[in-house]
Curated annotation (Swiss-Prot):
Species the sequence originates in: Ralstonia nicotianae (strain ATCC BAA-1114 / GMI1000) (Ralstonia solanacearum)
Annotated stretches, region: Disordered: 212-236
Keywords: Cytoplasm, Endonuclease, Hydrolase, Manganese, Metal-binding, Nuclease
Protein name, entry field: Ribonuclease HII
Domain of life, per lineage: Bacteria
Main location: cytoplasm
Compartment(s) where it occurs, according to its Swiss-Prot or TrEMBL record: Cytoplasm
GO molecular function (one): manganese ion binding
Cofactor binding mode and count: Manganese or magnesium. Binds 1 divalent metal ion per monomer in the absence of substrate. May bind a second metal ion after substrate binding.
InterPro entries: RNase_HII (IPR022898), RNase_HII/HIII (IPR001352), RNase_HII/HIII_dom (IPR024567), RNaseH-like_sf (IPR012337), RNaseH_sf (IPR036397)
Cofactors, names only: Mn(2+); Mg(2+)
């Protein structure tokens, strides 16, 4: 699949059924994670990282438990020391066209393809969560992998820092929405800004609060975003 493809990606076979499983000793591990599944605006971002065992990185952890300052410092160290890394995304248009789950898988596919394009071919791709994208390598899902597997922790940091930077840039273009504060998540501040200023081209029209705003419907009682549409601002 090319970087511009919007073909709906298939979920991977479980590791035991993957044709690549068991063919080689697993020495090159590639961690994969995403940021931005839940927000009402902006792309969904994914990163793939192959760490260099000869250049250990101290302090790797789930990006959600790190301060922004610590994430930025680790980002610089990861891109300097990793054997290979790549950050990719699926656009708002792709999210609306194929849904957020498939768009997330697409971004992950692109991230792994970016690592492979550097000549680093993983023996095993380890993905945070309970679903895997279909890639040309053995792959396994690890629930809470961003807290358990260093390469996934590194990927979570690259994905989150990249997406936070994108939303900070979006704030400069649309300061009235407060993207620098909520990163596109459905906070009361963001919902109020949508009601007051309308929807930007960067909002996900397939998400219910945005769709309601476009239809002119009032927000539901309590003015809260349903959990099916968004997670908290610290969830990625």
């Amino acid at each position: 699949m090319t970087a511009d493809s919007t073909e709906i990606p298939q979920l991977a076979l479980p590791l035991s059924q993957s044709p690549a499983a068991g063919k080689r000793a697993r020495r090159i591990l590639c961690g994969v994670d995403e940021a931005g599944r839940g927000p009402l605006a902006g792309p969904v971002t994914a990163a793939a990282v192959v760490l260099n065992p000869r250049k250990p990185i101290q302090g790797l952890a789930d990006s959600k438990v790190l301060t922004a300052k610590k994430r930025e410092a680790l980002y610089d160290e990861i891109v300097e020391k990793a054997l290979a890394w790549h950050v990719a995304e699926a656009t708002v248009e792709e999210i609306d066209r194929i849904n957020i789950l498939h768009a997330t898988m697409l971004a992950m596919q692109r991230a792994v393809q970016g690592v492979a394009a550097q000549g680093v071919l993983p023996d095993l791709v380890q993905v945070d969560g309970n679903r895997c994208p279909q890639v040309a390598f053995a792959v396994e899902a690890i629930v809470k992998g961003d807290a358990l597997v260093p390469a996934i922790s590194a990927a979570s940091i690259l994905a989150k820092v990249t997406r936070d930077r994108q939303l900070a840039a979006l704030h400069i273009a649309f300061p009235q929405y407060g993207f620098d504060v909520h990163a596109g998540y459905g906070t009361p501040q963001h919902l109020a800004a949508i009601e007051r200023h309308g929807v930007t081209p960067h909002h996900r029209r397939s998400f219910a609060p945005v769709r309601r705003a476009l239809d002119g419907a009032p927000p539901p009682a309590g003015d809260a975003v349903p959990q099916t549409d968004a997670k908290t601002a610290w969830a990625d």
